[in-house]
Amino acid sequence: MSDEFPAICDSCCGPDKHIKMMRQANGEECKVCTRPFTVFRWNPNNGTNKSKKTIICMTCARARNCCQSCMLDITYGIPLEIRDTALKMAGLEHASQIKSSNTSQNREVKAIMADKQEAKYNNEDNDVNKSNDRSEMARDILSKLSEKLNGNTNALIKKAPKNSKTTKKNEIINVKNADISKILGKLPLGGSIVVPETTPELSSFFLFGFSDDIPQYIISDFCNKFGKIKSLSIVHRAKCGYVVFTTRKAAESFATTIMENGLNKNTATPGLLILNNKYPVRVSWGKQKPLVTTNEECHKLSLVITKVMRQLAEKDKIFEDQKITKKAKNHKTSSDANEHSSNTASTQHYKALRPDFEL
């Protein structure tokens, strides 16, 4: 399959008509299939001064019909899980479609499946006998979903003049005005990793604070060490997600391991976990809730989570300092008590059993 040009949505490309890209052959591992792929990097010039890059290979992007950078539907800009669920409810799911959540946890199996899929795409001819009615129905459903979730931002971007300073300014304002207060109120950012006895049916965790370039298989491989995973939902752009275990026993084993890794002396804050010795992740018990969907909400939530990560680090440092101070104070009190006891013993006077007398 050709790697001359990536599959990128309009939102990731930015408002400019011409963009400069850097191409690196076999630059990184695909986040889905773990195979090396050609990475593209560019600056979208959308007012954020943050460069973008492709994070999945062309084969996985084509199988999911998604953008190689943001992993949203490349046509309608909606999350893949919502898209697939809507099409499934309407009875329009494709039989050969690879689901966005890969059930295999083995790296070699993922790579083999991707190789087969790539060979299939290279050999297949365009199917001209697809049902036009079903395609039209699917497009209608996805268009309505896009309007509801994104506020019809795709249409606004297409109509807006390119290379316009007003467009860039409006994009920044949209990010600032994105309301995520209701979503934040449901997220256990101040939770704990201590096993809750009051909710024995709970077997899910809220993960947050990880880097947006962490491969999802690193998280899934670590979680699978403790038992079978029911679902793993990660939103890289928002730096958060949920993992749900099939059994409570597996969930408790997962929590206990994090508590005993030597990084969580303060049990009042979410547990800290370091994956692959370079990806810090905070973990807390929490029932799975809907996460953000639009680009503006994801960006704003990622900023909030970054701030929360700094606050949690400061709390852990204060807790550690207080613990050291208390220990030193107790040691000093113990030393003073021993010294006082020693001085008391040295000042004791001789007391004769009988009255002294002078010869």
UniProtKB/Swiss-Prot annotation:
InterPro entries: Cwc2/Slt11, Nucleotide-bd_a/b_plait_sf, RBD_domain_sf, Slt11_RRM, STL11/RBM22-like_N
Biological process annotations from GO: mRNA processing; RNA splicing
Biased composition range(s): Polar residues: 340-349
GO annotation, cellular component aspect: Prp19 complex; U2-type catalytic step 1 spliceosome; U2-type catalytic step 2 spliceosome
Record-linked Gene3D superfamilies: 3.30.70.330
Subcellular location: Nucleus
Keywords: mRNA processing, mRNA splicing, Nucleus, RNA-binding, Spliceosome
GO terms assigned for molecular function: pre-mRNA binding; U6 snRNA binding
Coiled-coil ranges (or none): none
Residue ranges, annotated region (Disordered): 324-359
Keyword Nucleus part of the UniProt annotation: yes
Superkingdom of the organism of origin: Eukaryota
Role noted for this protein: Involved in pre-mRNA splicing. Facilitates the cooperative formation of U2/U6 helix II in association with stem II in the spliceosome. Binds to RNA.
Assigned protein family: Belongs to the SLT11 family.
PANTHER family (UniProt xref): PRE-MRNA-SPLICING FACTOR RBM22
Subunit details: Associated with the spliceosome.
Name used for this protein in its record: Pre-mRNA-splicing factor SLT11
